[in-house]
A protein has these predicted regions:
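Phosphate/NTP-binding elements of NTP-utilizing enzymes
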Residues: 1-174
Length: 174
């Protein structure tokens, strides 16, 4: 049983630890390995997709011998990457939550989720249900800190110890 059998994987590390790049490798490999799969990368802004995500993904494709126009296309108007095998990578932002719901997805990758509200994650998680594919969610970010919403998900016992208060009514005379 390896990481491929888990529904959700989290990649955390310090700045410049290549978390996004490692996750993009996973995004691209999934899209190539599973024809006609649909996945979504959620970034904070469209500018991040333009300056960071798209260049890194297309660089990976180029390094793997794939050619633009032959093996993949980038639609910069709709923020979608379509591969020759029918797979689609949707590029969406947390600043436009109205654009998040949509097609059923096989995989989901919120990048820098630390800066996103929990509602973004909970809004799009139910769409990871594309029939016939292994469903995966991988998140990449610098750590969110002890009080971040993600800690409730991945470290619930520790979160409860540190942050939940048990209120016990006082009895008279105590």
């Amino acid at each position: 049983r390896g990481p491929e059998s888990e529904l959700m994987l989290r990649v955390c590390g310090g700045r410049y630890a290549a978390k996004t790049y490692a996750s993009l490798i996973r995004d691209a490999k999934y899209a190539l390995y599973y024809p006609s799969s649909r996945g979504m990368i959620i970034s904070l802004t469209k500018a991040n997709h333009r300056s960071n995500i798209i260049p890194k993904l297309t660089g990976l494709f180029r390094d793997w011998g794939l050619r633009h126009g032959t093996h993949y296309d980038v639609n910069k108007n709709d923020y979608e990457i379509t591969l020759y095998n029918g797979s689609i990578i949707y590029l969406r932002t947390s600043q436009e939550p109205e654009n998040l719901p949509g097609p059923d997805l096989a995989w989901l990758h919120p990048d820098e989720y630390k800066s996103m509200p929990e509602s973004i994650f909970t809004q799009v998680l139910p769409t990871v249900r594309q029939y016939g594919y292994p469903h995966q969610v991988w998140l990449s970010s610098t750590p969110g800190g002890a009080a971040h919403w993600s800690r409730r998900i991945w470290q619930p016992d520790q979160y409860a110890i540190d942050f939940d208060l048990e209120v016990v009514p006082r009895r008279a005379g105590r």
